[in-house]
Amino acid sequence: QFTQAASSDHPTVFTWEGWEVPELHKAYVDKHGSSPNIAIFADEEEAFAKMRAGFKVDLTQPCTYKVPIWYDAGILDPIDTSRLGNWPDIISSLKTIPGTVINGQQYFIPTDWGQTSVVYRADLAPEYVNNETWGILWDPKYRGRLAMADSLIDGVMVAAIYIGAKNPFDMTDEEVKKTRAALKEQLPLLRFYWGSSSEMEQAVAAGEVVAATAWNDGYTKLKGEGIDVKYMNPKEGAMTWVCGFCLMKDHDPAKLDKIYDYLDAYMSVESGVYEIVEYGYGHGNAKAFEAVSPGKLKELGFSTNAEEMLASGIFQEPIANEPALQTMFEEVKAGL
């Protein structure tokens, strides 16, 4: 499960489930005959721990809020954007996200963006259709039929937004206490914390789960299966995120050409169209949006202006006091 059969002449890409598919790097396969080596992580904390423990990879695909932390840990190398033919077509606001350009050097290539929100069964919880709130995930009426992401950013931060933390990513002690209390209150209501989005999607499709934290792709897939789901714009605000690639300090220099080929393939218009249409995510390449019909974009929930969409919601930032929050989350899950 963890690593696909490794081939010594390809770089290793460490990424999320779903972003490893060949359709997102077709030009690389066309040029080099196969995909690179792929390893999958459930979240960035797991990825970081594995790399710290000596797992060597060439590229990782974290979200922006991790980049300053990984930079400070000394595990990133700058990326030479002049080697990327698709760089000029990347949405300009994504190129300068705080914490991703350091001392004038680019440490992150923005390729994927979207939201963390709630996917829910409109047929099973109709009272939320015109009352969209994160509060559905705390509704005792749906005890045992709710699911939450098993992660700091999409779990603990959701609780922080729900309790009204002024800045969920930099909470006061009082807000941390309230967040902990909210997670404790929620625990007996959950069917599970999900680590794999496909596990959550199956439960929603079956009606075992009525509402869950989800990314756009979960909603897009369920909707495509004809399930009566909606994707919330919660009154407290959805979370907006941007993910993309980092070049690891211990990359294999002999594979650098292939590393840049992979990045450029993922940044292409054709990869962007696939990601937009199949997953309902935004893509870094502005031209990819021009290649999808306005009707299709609307159906997928995109206002035609990517910049406007990126400016909406609560933008993920590096989490202050991360180790303490991680410990608190583990304690809550253990019933403490």
What are these regions (language model features)?
Residues 19, 56, 61-202:
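Extracytoplasmic ligand-binding site segments that recognize negatively charged/polar headgroups
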Residues 66-71, 213-228:
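A ligand-binding cleft/hinge motif common to bilobed small-molecule-binding domains
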Residues 77-88, 108, 227-239, 250:
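Short beta-strand->loop
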